[in-house]
């Protein structure tokens, strides 16, 4: 047990680094030293802490999608694991899309044995392939990933190497720090160039309002209504909850679906209520084809937190991304503390503000609310949808 005088460092919040590995031996003798070293260097690293408790594969694949860099720790027993090979196939997919940088680590196994499926590494794969011959499309993806990923520039540690694991880990940390720094510089340059085509407007901080989290804070608001030319009010364009991609929303023990009527004779609105989860992820998309070019719009999650809501000690992350027709993208990230809204009525949680590009270059707007803090189970969040409305 740590002494009461020990200093607890804040959790890193930079680009996520996903680690794919296999086996208790690798975890005990390598990963258990690598991960603390990365976190000590303020690198935001994710590993499957619940490897032996049957973590859901969908959660791990989502983690890969949220990562910008992946470390694949190839060891002799790597190819004995369905889980690792499924992760590897997803890593290859993201790499091929240009969404993920991959560093293969050859831990006491030859790079050639991995790439050409030689020795025990290859024997393990062929045995797994035979046992799953009825799953040919999946095993083919495994094989393609095993051929592709080792081709990236990696770092080998031979079985009989005179180099210590500690020395090897230190060199890994330095390499990863350099990569993350280069990624940050490249991203800033890309954003500056892309703003000539699509403007993303960061949320403004109200005067006199401090943000305890250190980022830009925009207070949640009650959903607004716009006046029509006839003087009546109309509800802003809404992406309903059912059209959002809410992780685990199909599982009644985690989310409950119900309907509400906000006014007499009004249409029913379907809402999703969070029962209890560790990982929260809600994603929605729209295209700009039906929006006014050059106009500024905001995307806000319309939610409320019930009186018994809990598990919101850490803020949620909000991301708005504009993906252009040529695959380029720009984005804004911010955080919001939902604890402040427990027991209130419907509020708007700002995802971001964007300027619509010309009709000739339409874009897809992706808005995300997520929080992967696995220390607290979250409950009591009610989701109505995401409102898209013009701003002044």
Curated annotation (Swiss-Prot):
TIR domain segment(s): 13-180
Domain comment as written in the entry: The TIR domain mediates NAD(+) hydrolase (NADase) activity. Self-association of TIR domains is required for NADase activity.
InterPro entries, sorted: PP2-like (IPR025886), PP2-like/Lectin (IPR052147), TIR_dom (IPR000157), Toll_tir_struct_dom_sf (IPR035897)
Example GO molecular function: carbohydrate binding
Keywords: Hydrolase, NAD
Gene3D superfamilies: Toll/interleukin-1 receptor homology (TIR) domain (3.40.50.10140)
Catalytic activity: NAD(+) + H2O = ADP-D-ribose + nicotinamide + H(+)
Catalytic residues of the enzyme: 87
Protein name: Protein PHLOEM PROTEIN 2-LIKE A6
Region annotated Disordered, chain positions: 202-236
Naturally occurring in which organism (per UniProt): Arabidopsis thaliana (Mouse-ear cress)
GO biological process: signal transduction
Entry keyword annotation includes DNA repair: no
Pfam family, one: TIR
Taxon lineage: Eukaryota, Viridiplantae, Streptophyta, Embryophyta, Tracheophyta
EC number: 3.2.2.6
Disulfide bonds: none
């Amino acid at each position: 047990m740590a002494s009461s005088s020990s200093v607890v460092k804040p959790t890193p919040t930079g680009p996520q680094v996903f680690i794919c590995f296999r086996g208790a031996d690798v975890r005990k003798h390598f990963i258990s030293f690598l991960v603390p070293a990365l976190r000590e260097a303020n690198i935001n690293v994710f590993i499957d802490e619940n490897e032996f408790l049957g973590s859901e594969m969908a959660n791990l694949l989502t983690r890969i999608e949220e990562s910008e860099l992946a470390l694949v720790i190839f060891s002799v027993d790597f190819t004995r694991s369905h889980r690792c090979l499924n992760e590897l196939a997803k890593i290859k997919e993201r790499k091929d899309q240009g969404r993920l940088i991959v560093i293969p680590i050859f831990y006491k196994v030859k790079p050639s044995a991995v790439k050409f499926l030689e020795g025990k590494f290859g024997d393990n794969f062929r045995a797994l392939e035979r046992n799953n011959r009825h799953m040919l499309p999946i095993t083919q993806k495994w094989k393609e990933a095993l051929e592709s990923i080792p081709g990236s520039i990696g770092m080998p540690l031979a079985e009989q190497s005179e180099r210590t694991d500690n020395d090897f880990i230190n060199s890994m940390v330095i390499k990863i720090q350099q990569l993350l720094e280069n990624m940050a510089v490249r991203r800033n340059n890309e954003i500056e160039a892309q703003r000539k085509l699509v403007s993303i407007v960061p949320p403004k901080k109200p005067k006199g309002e401090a943000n305890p989290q250190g980022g830009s804070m925009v207070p949640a608001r009650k959903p607004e209504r716009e006046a029509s030319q006839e003087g009546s009010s109309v509800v802003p364009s809404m992406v309903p909850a059912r059209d959002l991609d809410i992780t685990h929303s199909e599982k009644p023990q985690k989310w409950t679906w119900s309907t509400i009527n906000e006014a007499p004779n009004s249409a029913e609105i379907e809402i999703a209520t969070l029962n209890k989860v560790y990982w929260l992820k809600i994603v929605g998309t729209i295209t700009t084809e039906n929006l006014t070019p050059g106009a500024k719009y905001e995307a806000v999650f319309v939610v409320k937190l019930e009186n018994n809501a809990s598990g919101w000690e850490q803020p949620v992350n909000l991301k708005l991304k504009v993906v252009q027709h040529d695959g380029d993208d720009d984005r804004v990230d911010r955080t919001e503390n939902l604890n402040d809204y427990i027991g209130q009525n419907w509020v708007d949680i700002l995802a971001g503000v964007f300027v619509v590009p010309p009709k000739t270059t339409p874009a897809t707007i992706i808005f995300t609310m997520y929080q992967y803090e696995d220390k607290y189970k979250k409950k009591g969040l009610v989701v109505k949808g995401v409102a898209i409305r013009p701003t002044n």
